[in-house]
Amino acid sequence: MLEHEQKNVWKMIGMRIRRERIKRNWSQSGLCYGICAVSYLSKIEQGKMEVSEEILKLLLERLELPWIDDKETKDLESFVEAQYEFLFTHPIQEFLKQKEIFQEKKEKLYSSSLIADACILEAVYESRKDEIEEGLERYLDFRQLAVLRMLQGRLDEAITLLPIPFMYMRAGEILYETGQNYASAISYLQMGYNLAAQEGMEMLMLQCRIIIGNCYSNQQELENMEREYQIASRLARDLHQTEILKVINYNRASTWVALGSYKKAYDYFSKVEEPAILDLHKLAICCEAYGRKAEGIEAVKRAERMGEFGDDPDDEKQLEVEMCRLVRYRLEHENYLKEEEYEKLLFPCFEKMKARLPVGFAVFHVPYVLEWYTDRRQYKQAYEMVRKYGGFIPVL
């Protein structure tokens, strides 16, 4: 480790000791009693001096934090490198599934020279943007800073720091999810695909093509969407990614629903062998369009049973069930637009979709919000919504 890097490590460890001391509401004199002078601890917390191994070990022990020896540090370094390798070669959703493994190592990482990596990796797992330890940013290396910039949505800075396929893919994915700029999203994703192909990163290639297809779907460009989904489907089959194939098929059929091709969509969703909640949601909407009330209600009930074991209100599955209940309410109440209970279901669900899901989910439900505004003669609100979502509003 270079001298300036070692100094940065001491500063970060000092910050950790200070944070843990304050968390426990301890004074400096209380922490360092019998170990070192208060002035010495003060300099340690400010990162102004190198800490002797013996004193550091005693301070960490008093704070009930683990002491990491050289051998364990090497093991942790290998773990951190493996984490970055997986992060940079897979879709972010796959990386997030490793959170439990990270949690097992977290405390040791925070007590080691890898504290900066611990902060950054935890920020990825927790989807933090601006909650990085105060004062830490100036000690980050280019890789750590690039990941932080990506989390903060400072996309060009992230790519400049680390121009790898993953960064281009994530930049495009973020722009797609927020609906900010589909043209830029597609440009980033195409570059990410090309770079991933050069390096043989098949999963990133697949992810880029799916998201490009999603961008075209949200813009209702069916021909371009179909081309991208066909490419993605070939890649998914070659990689034996059967679950991803289901996602592609769902996205395609959902676009048909949004464009009012209910017969085509019904033929697909009614034949899905093991439907997910969102498959049943779209099936219920198709049934609603065709007046198949009983079949639509049964689809929603099935979706509700699938989500009944979750008790976390922030769980994505619970939000999907809320979307299904909107359809059920319309199926069971002919004059739903006149009923206050429908309003209580519609608007909270719509706000959650905007906050927690890719923009396409909210766009899909815009017609139902417009329908309610129009019925209540709230034309100003309806106009503002049309202005915001432009020409990409689905057919009702």
Language-model features: where?
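A short, Lys/Arg-rich alpha-helix, primarily the initiator
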Residues: 1-23
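Residue at a conserved register position within TPR or TPR-like alpha-solenoid repeats
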Residues: 86, 119, 126, 149, ...
